[in-house]
């Protein structure tokens, strides 16, 4: 079985790294929609169209299962498009909500504007723990910082402090990284939070559930190949991905095929 992962850019590599750690024998195709980065400022209709195009392309590549390594797509597109495909399609919201709700009662979520506006995390967490209080904060400057390789320094601390201030004021006990780009900023974010706050990385939660659902052979130590594709500049993506993968990936640019007429509406 080939697993498809996709994100708008580098964020999904946090999911890929977790797969390499937990499921090293799992073959993966990773697609980064870098030509349309970031997704967080897109409309729900745009995001659903992009996701349909990616899933259609994954089908053509022989992918049997897809994990949306993007919270925005998981929040806005997964409930709409998953049933349209024979692929098994999963996302990040539900696993992260389950992880947050296990112990958290005052839960902060930092995410893209589109994810926050969907209130997907609030609904998912409160469906599990109705008494939980959830505060969601949009952090639109985080993705450009990560994609630009700016992960430390006073600029990053200043931006993070501004986003986290209302959550610290609410005395949260749990923080969900509601975008796969945000764990790259964990050293700064963690330094600005009280030591008692537990951070939830959706990549860890989602891959743990994926590992439990796959046959034991996928958990062997043999390393499977990962093939990388982008809609934008492959050289730029490879250079940006190198520090996080510890190797220089071979990346191929692709043009996503047009959707079948029945899916263009």
Curated annotation (Swiss-Prot):
Pathway: Cell wall biogenesis; peptidoglycan biosynthesis. The active site is at 70 (proton donor/acceptor), 179 (proton donor/acceptor). One of its GO terms (biological process) is regulation of cell shape. One of its GO terms (molecular function) is glutamate racemase activity. Substrate binds at residues 7-8, 39-40, 71-72, 180-181. It is an enzyme of class 5 (isomerase). SUPFAM superfamilies: Aspartate/glutamate racemase. Its EC number is 5.1.1.3. HAMAP family: Glu_racemase. Belongs to the aspartate/glutamate racemases family. Provides the (R)-glutamate required for cell wall biosynthesis. This is Glutamate racemase. The gene is murI.
């Amino acid at each position: 079985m080939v697993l498809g992962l996709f994100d708008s850019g580098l964020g999904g590599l946090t999911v890929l790294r977790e797969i390499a750690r937990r499921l090293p024998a799992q073959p993966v195709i990773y697609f980064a929609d870098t030509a349309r980065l970031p997704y967080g400022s897109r409309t729900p209709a745009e995001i659903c169209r992009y996701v349909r195009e990616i899933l259609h392309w994954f089908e053509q590549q022989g992918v049997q299962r897809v994990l949306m390594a993007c919270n925005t797509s998981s929040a806005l597109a997964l409930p709409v498009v998953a049933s349209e495909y024979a692929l098994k399609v999963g996302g990040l919201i539900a696993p992260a909500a389950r992880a947050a709700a296990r112990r958290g009662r005052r839960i902060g979520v930092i995410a893209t504007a589109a994810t926050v506006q969907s209130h997907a995390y609030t609904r998912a967490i409160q469906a599990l723990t109705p008494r939980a209080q959830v505060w969601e904060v949009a952090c639109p400057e985080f993705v450009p910082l990560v994609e630009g390789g700016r992960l430390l320094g006073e600029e990053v601390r200043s931006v993070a402090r501004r986003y986290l201030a209302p959550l610290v004021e609410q005395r949260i006990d749990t923080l969900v990284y509601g975008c796969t780009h945000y764990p790259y900023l964990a050293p700064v974010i963690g330094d600005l939070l009280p030591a008692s706050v537990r951070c939830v990385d959706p990549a860890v939660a989602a891959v743990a559930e994926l590992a439990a659902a796959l046959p034991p052979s996928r958990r062997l130590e043999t390393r499977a190949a990962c093939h990388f594709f982008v809609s934008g500049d492959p050289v730029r993506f490879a250079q940006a991905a190198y520090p996080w993968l510890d190797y220089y990936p071979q990346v191929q640019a692709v043009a996503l095929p047009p959707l079948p007429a029945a899916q263009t509406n």
